[in-house]
Swiss-Prot record:
Source lineage: Bacteria, Pseudomonadati, Chlamydiota, Chlamydiia, Chlamydiales
GO cellular component, one term: cytosolic large ribosomal subunit
HAMAP family, A to Z: Ribosomal_uL11
GO BP term, example: translation
GO function term, MF aspect, one: structural constituent of ribosome
Matching InterPro entries: Ribosomal_uL11 (IPR000911), Ribosomal_uL11_bac-typ (IPR006519), Ribosomal_uL11_C (IPR020783), Ribosomal_uL11_C_sf (IPR036769), Ribosomal_uL11_CS (IPR020785), Ribosomal_uL11_N (IPR020784), Ribosomal_uL11_N_sf (IPR036796)
Protein name per Swiss-Prot or TrEMBL: Large ribosomal subunit protein uL11
Quaternary assembly: Part of the ribosomal stalk of the 50S ribosomal subunit. Interacts with L10 and the large rRNA to form the base of the stalk. L10 forms an elongated spine to which L12 dimers bind in a sequential fashion forming a multimeric L10(L12)X complex.
Entry-linked SMART domains: RL11
Keyword entries, A-Z: Methylation, Ribonucleoprotein, Ribosomal protein, RNA-binding, rRNA-binding
GN (gene name): rplK
Family statement drawn from the similarity comment of this UniProt entry: Belongs to the universal ribosomal protein uL11 family.
């Protein structure tokens, strides 16, 4: 890949194992000239062990219309909703609380998300998770 020139970076959030050519994937990749079905098959094969998780993916498109992609960990808000079995956060976060997150859950989420965060210390990652939880209307014990 030393001579290939990067022409576009595409960032999407796609449920694991459920990529299909429908919007938003099709139009984003079609505009870059990428083989849409080729991407969908590769992505679904790579993420079949994480069905239903909303996965951020960064697709790098090269000048010869080939591509590579990197999947990341699900967003913190998705991990919190999954841990508490919630559909969504509170509409009014400072008034209506929709759940409680224990320190053990905060630590587990922070450890899972650490490699995608720009932090070195686990305590910093935990504070980021706690802040996201508070903005969703979730109390942190």
């Amino acid at each position: 890949m030393s001579n290939k020139k990067v022409i576009k970076l595409i960032k999407l959030q796609i449920p694991g194992g459920k990529a299909n050519p429908a919007p938003p994937i099709g139009p984003a990749l079609g505009a870059a000239g990428v083989n849409i079905m080729g991407f969908c098959k590769e992505f679904n094969a790579a993420t079949q062990d994480r069905p239903g998780d909303l996965l951020p993916v960064v697709i790098t498109v090269y000048s010869d219309k080939t591509f590579t992609f990197i999947t990341k960990q699900p967003p913190v808000s998705s991990l919190i909703k999954k841990a508490l079995n919630l559909e969504s956060g509170s509409k009014i976060p400072n008034r209506n609380k929709v759940g409680k997150l224990t320190q053990a859950q905060v630590t587990a989420i922070a450890e899972q998300k650490m490699k995608d965060m720009d932090v070195v210390l686990l305590d910093s990652a935990k504070r980021m998770v706690e802040g996201t939880a508070r903005s969703m209307g979730i109390d942190v014990e």
